[in-house]
From Swiss-Prot:
Protein name: [LysW]-L-2-aminoadipate/[LysW]-L-glutamate phosphate reductase
UniProt-listed Enzyme Commission number(s): 1.2.1.103, 1.2.1.106
Compartments, as annotated in UniProt: Cytoplasm
Free-text function comment from the UniProt entry: Involved in both the arginine and lysine biosynthetic pathways.
CDD domains attached to this UniProt entry: AGPR_1_C_LysY, AGPR_1_N
InterPro entries: AGPR_AS (IPR023013), AGPR_type-1 (IPR000706), LysY (IPR037535), NAD(P)-bd_dom_sf (IPR036291), NAGSA_dehydrogenase (IPR050085), Semialdehyde_DH_NAD-bd (IPR000534)
Family: Belongs to the NAGSA dehydrogenase family. Type 1 subfamily. LysY sub-subfamily.
Amino acid sequence: MIRVAVIGGSGYTGGELLRLLAMHNKVEVTYITSREYAGKPISIIHPNLRGFYNINFSQFSWDKIGEKAEAVFLALPHKVSVDYVPKLLEMGLQVVDLSADFRLKNPELYKLWYEFDHPYPDLLKKAVYGIPEIHYEELKGAKLIASPGCNSTATILAAAPLVYSNILDNYRLISDVKVGSSEGGAKPSEGSHHPERQNAIRPYEAEGHRHAAEVEQELQYISKKEVKISLVPHAVSTIRGALASVHGWLISDDLNEIEFWKKIIEFYRGRKFVRVIRGNIHPYPDPKYVIGSNFVDIGFAVEKRVGRITMFSAIDNLMKGAAGQAVQAFNVSRGFEEDEGLRIPPLRPA
């Protein structure tokens, strides 16, 4: 059994990690931290986990983390994880970081998108971007996994087979992402508090969302071409779920849709959590049918009149968009079955 710590275990992502790791046959969660709730039972904050954990939240301690863990999941805010990762690695611990602090390879992009000088550019080169569908081989044995968030995951998985297939007139894409209120975290703000989002469809960061940087990085890795993407998220009134609609323009108006569908299947062949959607009853991906699971549903539509193709992906933002994908990448890094702890069908109704 691998002894695992969750640092920042009181938020939605931390709670989802704890839910999944409770069902994982290869790990034992030995240390869970929260500054605000130290000393209190896990079930006080996560009542859904009542009976699954008999340990309390702890204050973070460098001495204790070294004694109690072999691998660490960091569910901390951006610009906070960066101060933990180097020392954890020096101590010989594996790190799965769910913040954005090690996702970008180019340190200059942190100045542009996050307005800070990255203090550990050498570690950026060593971090493996944690989408197993794209970086399966690189994740094997990885010591530092930079796990992406929901907007970037949904966009990348929708666009990846598109940019790979050489069917586009240009590589300037638009991603429209609709995402539920849990993306905003457990601490409500005016923009994320659910009563403020109910009955709303609200775009945000429309002038340029910072996740566009990692999306472009990954799509350029896949296509070997310069890719530019405009990523505009929209806050909607669901609690869970994210739907990405990625628009591109075709090089020709005679695309064989059956052949392209086969190319998508081939691109994701062997990946346990990708489901390619095509049919008459539910022809396009819908987050409603992946809630509670680590699946991503992929589909597409072509409007030949204007030469446009739209790729769709639907995920649960707390699962494939956060905790589920982090556990999946951890599994690959350790040589476990990719779906260990994740063999969960979606909820219905949800």
